């Protein structure tokens, strides 16, 4: 009985080891060689030093992402960037020829940007300098080929950077006025008389509705830009397709916010209390869903155009004549 039990166990298949993600697999393979181990240790040391130098920048990121709904997607951006880097690692290891000159240049620019913000407190300079520092570490220890391959993953980190307040309001204020005017035209055209004064809409009965910055489209624009850029990168389509998809983030965000203001206007004309509190929150969720539906419809239309542009098949040659 014991012998049969042992033989049965011996005949059972050995468990298949789980494969590491490509990015981690490259790190593991690099650690097995002396040069690769030296490069990994140096990169880790530089990364730790960069985190210490930009500690206030990293804390600022977390604070803004946690408190400002315009940048609540910031927590996802580094994770998506890692996903893109893992995708790039699927193509195998790059030729590891450290680009010392380029790496030192990028790290020097990052350090200068960080020091400049101590003298002149311009937060975005430090934010972008941190990304430049990451690129410098890649170039210094992995080379130009690695920087080229993982360049998009690094560049995508730009979407986690909060805009300066002055720049944000410079963009948001015209969008507020644009959304207000378009919404007023639609409300008047659908039978609800509205007087538009800047970003204030006066409804029948003297009810006044204020189109706030949250309804300007900036909140959706920041998220949609990151989303459309990610989708464009993942979509195996022509370059013009990807550029159109990224550029459509602006009209999609504006259209969704105009629809929200129009819906709010009709509800406030019926009962202003219904447009407050919980409904306003639900309305924001519906707005995001509406924007995603617009993007999905746009992709469907663009896909039809791409399909129409594809050749129907290889040209057939006439059969050679007999004899």
Language model: regions and residue ranges:
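Hydrophobic N-terminal alpha-helices or hydrophobic patches in metabolic proteins across all domains
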Residues: 2-323
């Amino acid at each position: 009985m014991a012998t049969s039990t042992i033989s049965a166990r011996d005949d059972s298949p050995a468990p298949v080891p789980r494969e590491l993600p490509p990015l981690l697999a490259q790190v593991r393979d690099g650690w097995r060689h002396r040069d690769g181990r030296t490069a990994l240790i140096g990169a880790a040391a530089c990364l730790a030093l960069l985190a210490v130098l930009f500690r206030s920048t990293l804390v600022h990121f977390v604070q803004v992402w946690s408190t400002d709904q315009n940048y609540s997607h910031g927590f996802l951006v580094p994770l998506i960037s890692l996903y893109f880097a893992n995708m790039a690692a699927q193509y195998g290891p790059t030729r590891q020829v450290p680009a010392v000159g380029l790496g030192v240049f990028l790290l020097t620019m990052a350090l200068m940007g960080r020091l400049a913000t101590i003298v002149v407190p311009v937060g975005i300079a430090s934010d972008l300098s941190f990304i430049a520092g990451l690129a410098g570490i890649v170039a210094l220890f992995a080379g130009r080929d690695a920087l080229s391959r993982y360049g998009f993953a690094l560049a995508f980190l730009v979407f986690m950077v909060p805009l300066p307040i002055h720049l944000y309001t410079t963009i948001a204020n015209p969008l507020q006025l644009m959304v207000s005017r378009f919404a007023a035209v639609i409300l008047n055209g659908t039978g609800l008389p509205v007087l538009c004064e800047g970003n204030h809409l006066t409804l029948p009965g003297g009810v006044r509705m204020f189109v706030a910055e949250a309804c300007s489209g900036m909140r959706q624009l920041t998220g949609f830009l990151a989303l459309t850029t990610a989708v464009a990168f993942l979509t195996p389509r022509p370059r013009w397709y990807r550029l159109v998809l990224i550029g459509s983030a602006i009209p999609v965000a504006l259209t969704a916010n105009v629809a929200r203001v129009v819906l709010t206007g009709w509800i406030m004309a019926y009962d202003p209390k219904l447009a407050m509190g919980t409904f306003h929150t639900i309305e924001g969720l519906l707005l995001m869903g509406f924007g995603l539906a617009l993007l999905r419809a746009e992709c469907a239309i663009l896909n039809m155009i791409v399909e129409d542009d594809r050749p129907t098949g290889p040209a057939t040659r006439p059969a050679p004549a007999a004899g």
